[in-house]
C-alpha cells in the first residue's frame, strides 16, 4: 500500500502542475482560490492504481455499522474507497479529505473507521501548508480519534497521510490502534517526510 500511496501523491502533484491527463479544475466565480482542490482527484488516482495492480476495490462502500449522522434513523454510512483481500473481506478502508474541513467531518469519518475492524488510511490533500496548518489539522485528528477510540474494534494499522501540492511533499505516519489506546500525535515532526 505504501507504493500506491506514493504513486497517488506523485500523480496528484503532477495534476496540480498540469503534467498529467487528470487536472484540478479552475473556479470561474470570484473565489480567492484559482483551482478547486478536492478529494475527487485522489479517488480517481487511487482507483487507477488499484486497477493497474489488479487489487480488488470498491468506491462509496456502505459501512456494516449504522450511524446517525443526519436525521433520526441510524443508517449505513459510506467509505470513500475499500480494498479487499482475496476472500472479499476488507483489507484497507480509505477516507479522503482536502483542505481544512470542520472538526465534525473528522469525527464523522473516525466514527466509521473505528467500527470497521480493518486497516485504515486517512489521505489528506493540501494545496499548501505551514506549521500552523498542521497544528490545526493534527488537533482535529487527535480530537476525532479520542472521541471514538473507546469504540475501536480489533487492533489495526492506520496511516495518516498528508500530500502538500505546492511544496511537493508527502507526510506519512503509521499508527497501531486498538480500543482505549491512542497516543496523541504531537506534531508534524513525527511524520516521515518525503520530497516528491
Task: Give the predicted meaning of each segment.
Residues 12-20, 46-54, 113-117, 138-153:
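Hydrophobic, Leu/Ile/Phe/Ala-enriched alpha-helical segments that form helix-helix packing faces
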Residues 127-196:
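Domain-level recognition of nuclease-like catalytic cores that cleave nucleotide substrates
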Residues 89-148:
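Catalytic cores of nucleic-acid endonucleases
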Residues 57, 118-121, 160:
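Hydrophobic anchor at the start of a short beta-strand
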Residues 39-41, 60-64, 95:
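Acidic-residue sensor for enzyme active/binding pockets
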Residues 34-35, 56-88:
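Active-site metal-binding core of divalent-cation-utilizing nuclease and nuclease-like domains
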Residues 42, 79, 92:
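Residue-level detector of short, conserved catalytic/binding motifs and their immediate flanks
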Residues 1-52:
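Interdomain/boundary linker segments immediately adjacent to catalytic/signaling cores
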Amino acid at each position: 500500500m505504501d507504493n500506491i500511496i506514493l504513486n497517488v501523491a506523485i500523480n496528484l502533484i503532477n495534476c496540480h502542475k498540469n503534467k498529467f491527463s487528470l487536472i484540478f479544475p479552475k473556479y470561474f466565480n470570484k473565489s480567492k482560490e484559482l483551482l478547486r482542490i478536492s478529494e475527487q482527484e485522489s479517488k480517481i488516482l487511487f482507483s487507477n492504481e488499484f486497477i493497474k495492480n489488479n487489487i480488488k476495490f470498491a468506491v462509496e462502500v456502505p459501512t456494516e455499522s449504522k450511524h446517525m449522522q443526519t436525521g433520526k434513523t441510524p443508517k449505513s454510512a459510506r467509505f470513500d474507497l475499500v480494498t479487499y483481500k482475496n476472500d472479499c473481506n476488507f483489507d484497507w478502508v480509505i477516507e479522503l479529505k482536502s483542505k481544512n474541513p470542520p472538526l465534525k467531518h473528522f469525527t464523522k469519518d473516525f466514527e466509521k473507521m473505528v467500527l470497521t475492524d480493518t486497516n485504515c488510511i486517512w489521505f489528506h490533500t493540501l494545496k499548501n501548508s505551514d506549521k500552523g496548518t498542521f497544528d490545526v489539522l493534527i488537533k482535529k485528528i487527535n480530537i476525532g480519534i479520542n472521541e471514538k477510540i473507546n469504540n475501536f474494534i480489533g487492533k489495526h494499522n492506520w496511516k495518516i497521510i498528508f500530500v502538500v501540492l505546492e511544496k511537493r511533499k508527502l507526510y506519512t505516519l503509521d499508527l497501531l490502534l486498538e480500543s482505549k489506546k491512542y497516543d496523541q500525535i504531537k506534531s508534524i515532526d513525527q511524520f516521515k517526510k518525503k520530497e516528491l
